[in-house]
């Protein structure tokens, strides 16, 4: 082996071909694995600190993300919060509304800058994915949300008769589009979030009968897959329901350890409760302690019951800011945010 590696002619030929490949295909097209043992992956905050922690910092930049779950589980809310975070940091975001169901009022309530949000409402799946591909290739857009995979109806299906049997059209469309999009994302740094619905497999008597729409290509191309579920309806006395408790399982993660769990509250009309997320992590890290129903900070009781503790922190933003900083430091997330980088040794 040493005789081969010390051959100067082979080393010279190797350097020549590596330089030629980089000239033809760009810097980083080929490299020695040891030169990039730790891959730098910038992240986009999700708007929920608990979810950021579960994903290893946030949504990875330049990657494909899939968020799937039942109806009214919080998929669109999470995506809109990510858009708001990108815009707050001065980035550009696009929303491809294949379902034609985007609510501008709700989006604005979540912090989305409606005036500067790029929105497309294409008539068919080919148009939607072509728009996404062109935005990715432009390298001028930081985040694209596609809502949803189930609504990406192929043109042939739209133009055909209602009774026509067309097998696998959408799966083939997704497979072809993802091949194009994935090849351009690494160079542009654009993140694409696909929202997806669940269906039931017919005739399944054992195992999980749930399956996502659009075939299997998205499962392979996605660096992160999030399974989001509504686990509780939030109620307050005579006021009735005011939100839901959502649980997210990181079903796949190529840039951080997978299978982590995150929970957070989604308040109707307001979105993710940031203070609620921070309180949960503060209790988890010991920044805030709970004995029975009482929550304490630095030895002083601040509230009885979780709702009152959240209210206290909302009414005392200075305390909330200090607690948030301590939580981030304890979780080693103090530098995480839009454009920041963390490291992974995951082999793609």
Swiss-Prot record:
What role does it play? Can catalyze the hydrolysis of ATP in the presence of single-stranded DNA, the ATP-dependent uptake of single-stranded DNA by duplex DNA, and the ATP-dependent hybridization of homologous single-stranded DNAs. It interacts with LexA causing its activation and leading to its autocatalytic cleavage.
- Give the GO molecular function terms: ATP binding; ATP hydrolysis activity; ATP-dependent DNA damage sensor activity; damaged DNA binding; single-stranded DNA binding
Q: Which SMART domains match?
A: AAA
The record's listing under NCBIfam families reads: tigrfam_recA
Domain of life according to the entry: Bacteria
BP term (GO), one: SOS response
| Protein localization | Cytoplasm
What are the record keywords, sorted? ATP-binding, Cytoplasm, DNA damage, DNA recombination, DNA repair, DNA-binding, Nucleotide-binding, SOS response
Protein's organism: Picosynechococcus sp. (strain ATCC 27264 / PCC 7002 / PR-6) (Agmenellum quadruplicatum)
The molecule here is called Protein RecA
């Amino acid at each position: 082996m040493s005789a081969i590696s010390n051959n100067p002619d082979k080393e010279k030929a190797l350097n020549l071909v590596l330089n030629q490949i980089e000239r033809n295909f760009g810097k980083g097209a080929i490299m020695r694995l040891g030169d990039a043992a730790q891959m730098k992956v910038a992240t986009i905050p999700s708007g929920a600190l608990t979810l950021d922690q579960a994903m290893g910092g946030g949504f990875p930049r330049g990657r494909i993300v899939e968020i799937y779950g039942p109806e009214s589980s919080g998929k669109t809310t999470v995506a809109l919060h990510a858009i708001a975070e990108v815009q707050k940091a001065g980035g550009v975001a696009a929303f491809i509304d294949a379902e034609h169901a985007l609510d501008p009022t709700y989006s604005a309530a979540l912090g989305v800058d409606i005036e500067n949000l790029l929105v497309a409402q294409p008539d068919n799946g080919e148009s939607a994915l072509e728009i996404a591909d062109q935005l990715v290739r432009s390298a001028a857009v930081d985040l694209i949300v596609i809502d949803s995979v189930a609504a990406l109806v192929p043109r042939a299906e739209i133009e055909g008769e209602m009774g026509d049997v067309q097998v696998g059209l959408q799966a083939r469309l997704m497979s072809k589009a993802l091949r194009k999009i994935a090849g351009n994302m690494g160079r542009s740094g654009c993140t694409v979030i696909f929202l997806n619905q669940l269906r039931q497999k017919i005739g399944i008597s054992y195992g999980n009968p749930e399956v996502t729409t659009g075939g299997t290509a998205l499962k392979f191309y996605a660096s992160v897959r999030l399974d989001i579920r509504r686990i509780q309806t939030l109620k307050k006395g005579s006021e009735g329901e005011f939100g839901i408790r959502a649980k997210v399982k990181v079903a796949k993660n190529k840039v951080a350890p997978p299978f982590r769990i995150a929970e957070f509250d989604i308040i109707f009309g307001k979105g993710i409760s940031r203070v609620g997320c921070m309180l949960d992590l503060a209790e988890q890290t010991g920044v805030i302690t709970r004995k029975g129903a009482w929550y304490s900070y630095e030895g002083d009781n601040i509230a009885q019951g979780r709702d009152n503790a959240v209210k206290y922190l909302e009414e005392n933003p200075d305390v909330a800011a200090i607690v948030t900083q301590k939580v981030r430091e304890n979780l080693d997330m103090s530098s995480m945010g839009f454009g920041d980088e963390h490291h992974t040794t995951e082999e793609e």
